Amino acid sequence: MKKGIHPENYRPVVFKDMSNEDIFITRSTMEAKETIEIDGVTYPLIKVEISNTSHPFFTGKAKLVDTAGRVDKFMSRYGDRNKKK
């Protein structure tokens, strides 16, 4: 590895998904203001709003958005602009 280009503070960090309280330990250079103790070891704690354990794409619990009503409303208001008068 090339010397002098890699971060010095690459260490184990805990990421906590705040939507479902899941935690996972990985290596990161992110700075943390809080710490958490897991199995007797203190780690820096990074809180995230969403992760792979709660994101609909990864969980398969996709939320369907009903846009058909919006399209119908638009078409009734403005009609088909491509029609020749």
From Swiss-Prot:
Protein family per UniProt: Belongs to the bacterial ribosomal protein bL31 family. Type B subfamily.
SUPFAM superfamilies: L28p-like
Name listed for the protein in its UniProt record: Large ribosomal subunit protein bL31B
Residues in coiled coil: none
GO MF: structural constituent of ribosome
Subunit structure: Part of the 50S ribosomal subunit.
Superkingdom field: Bacteria
Cross-referenced InterPro entries: Ribosomal_bL28/bL31-like_sf (IPR034704), Ribosomal_bL31 (IPR002150), Ribosomal_bL31_B (IPR027493), Ribosomal_bL31_sf (IPR042105)
GO biological process: translation
GO annotation, cellular component aspect: ribonucleoprotein complex; ribosome
Gene name, Swiss-Prot/TrEMBL: rpmE2
Annotated keywords: Ribonucleoprotein, Ribosomal protein
Organism per entry: Porphyromonas gingivalis (strain ATCC BAA-308 / W83)
